[in-house]
């Protein structure tokens, strides 16, 4: 992605299928507090390599409004995000969706309930014709080492402790930054 301006949308939680770029909304989805969404936005900004691309960070007011309709008159999330990027003067846009964010119950040494996260990062080419170029998906619930020995690498990478939902989401952000080339 040389010499392109990349818009970064704030984290949103899709609650209707028309808002999704892919995937589905889980049954019994719980709303994610605005404070948590803001914390995710702040963390994601720190993960981006500002020497690689020119970034334009969109605000909540930049993305407010109904979905744009496509040529057939249907509400279309892809066209909507591309339009928001173009309005910001960007060639591409990264759209982070957080479908589920479950905070750990307990402390770092022991948890009654583990942190869990389900997030997607979409790279959309906003130039006509609009196109979804890439998706990075991260869905994980931390497991104890006793329950899942296959996760020993993650266990040691996390310092042998129970992580918060924000820390777990940060792992998904790292994955997206690498996969998408941000």
For the regions a language model picked out, list residue spans one by one.
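Extracytoplasmic/secreted cell-surface and envelope-processing proteins
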Residues: 103-108
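Short glycine-rich beta-strand segments
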Residues: 99-101, 122
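C-terminal/domain-edge helix-coil "capping" segments
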Residues: 1-16, 84-88, 111-114, 118, ...
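Short, glycine/charged-enriched secondary-structure capping and boundary segments
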Residues: 21-23, 109-112
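N-terminal segment of the mature soluble domain
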Residues: 12-97, 126, 130-134, 166, ...
């Amino acid at each position: 992605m040389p010499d392109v301006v990349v818009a970064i949308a704030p984290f949103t939680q899709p609650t209707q299928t028309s808002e999704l770029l892919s995937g589905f909304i889980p049954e019994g989805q719980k709303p994610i507090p605005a404070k948590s969404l803001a914390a995710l936005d702040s963390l994601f900004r720190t993960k981006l390599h500002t020497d690689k691309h020119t970034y334009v960070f969109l605000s909540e007011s930049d993305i407010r409004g109904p979905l744009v309709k496509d040529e057939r008159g249907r509400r279309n999330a892809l066209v909507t995000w591309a339009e928001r990027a173009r309005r910001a003067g960007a060639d591409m846009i990264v759209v982070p969706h957080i479908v589920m964010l479950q905070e750990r119950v307990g402390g770092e040494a022991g948890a009654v309930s583990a942190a869990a996260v389900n997030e997607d990062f979409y790279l959309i080419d906003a130039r006509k014709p609009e196109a979804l170029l890439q998706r990075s998906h991260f869905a994980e619930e931390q497991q104890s080492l006793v329950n899942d020995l296959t996760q020993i690498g993650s266990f040691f990478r996390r310092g042998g402790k129970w992580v918060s939902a924000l820390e777990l989401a940060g792992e998904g952000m790292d994955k997206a930054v690498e996969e998408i080339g941000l």
